[in-house]
UniProtKB/Swiss-Prot annotation:
Disordered as annotated region, ranges: 176-199
Molecular function per GO: actin filament binding
Descriptive protein name: Transgelin-3
Gene Ontology, cellular component aspect: actin cytoskeleton; nucleus; synapse
Compositional bias ranges of the Polar residues kind: 176-188
Gene3D superfamilies in the record: Calponin-like domain
One GO process term, biological-process aspect: central nervous system development
Tissue: Widely expressed in the brain. Expression is increased in the superior frontal cortex of alcoholics, but not in the motor cortex or cerebellum.
Originating species: Homo sapiens (Human)
Modified residues (Phosphoserine): 163
CDD domains noted in UniProt: CH_TAGLN3
Record-annotated membrane-spanning stretches: none
Entry keyword set: Phosphoprotein
InterPro entries according to UniProt: Calponin-like (IPR050606), Calponin_repeat (IPR000557), CH_dom (IPR001715), CH_dom_sf (IPR036872), SM22_calponin (IPR003096)
């Protein structure tokens, strides 16, 4: 963490719970996908959450990733600078987040800049990258590079069209889900609260 001291008490417990959500196997899969997707000379980071954070922290890898998901000439982030200044790095991370939202990642799946830059919640960073990969696989526009089975495909709209005659036929059928229209009924039942008449 950049400028934060150690946490104690309840905040320590919360931080430990957040850190338990981080998945090392998922980290390896995401690193492999990012390197394959960017198709550039991006060095493979050593394993571990701290190295993964350091690898993504300046925002250049993330910006290259989102640019690689667009056709050449349509990249959302035209200028990527490898700067050592903190505000430039945080600006690049926020540019990536805006571009990811424009690409189709839901706002609920997007991490906050401090989650990555200060290493507060690297599991949220993993969730965002997984959501980005899922959207890329679902779009199937030829820009995704990698194994399609690495990410789940999001559900697509599948509209059905029925003619008026088919709709009328459906109204005449009593479905099995409704049960039988024969047998026991409530005929002869008395109202609620009335005594039962036994003769």
């Amino acid at each position: 963490m950049a400028n934060r001291g150690p946490s104690y008490g309840l905040s320590r417990e919360v931080q430990e719970k957040i850190e338990q959500k981080y998945d090392a196997d998922l980290e390896n899969k995401l690193v492999d996908w990012i390197i394959l997707q960017c198709a550039e000379d991006i060095e493979h980071p050593p394993p571990g959450r701290a190295h993964f954070q350091k690898w993504l922290m300046d925002g250049t890898v993330l910006c290259k990733l989102i640019n690689s998901l667009y056709p050449p000439g349509q990249e959302p982030i035209p200028k990527i600078s490898e700067s050592k200044m903190a505000f430039k790095q945080m600006e690049q991370i926020s540019q990536f987040l805006k571009a990811a939202e424009t690409y189709g990642v839901r706002t609920t799946d997007i991490f906050q800049t401090v989650d990555l830059w200060e290493g507060k919640d690297m599991a949220a960073v993993q969730r965002t990258l997984m959501a980005l990969g899922s959207v890329a696989v679902t779009k199937d526009d030829g820009c995704y590079r990698g194994e399609p089975s690495w990410f789940h495909r999001k559900a697509q709209q599948n509209r059905r069209g029925f003619s008026e005659e088919q709709l009328r036929q459906g109204q005449n059928v009593i479905g099995l889900q409704m049960g039988s229209n024969k047998g026991a009924s409530q005929a002869g039942m008395t109202g609620y609260g009335m005594p039962r008449q036994i003769m």
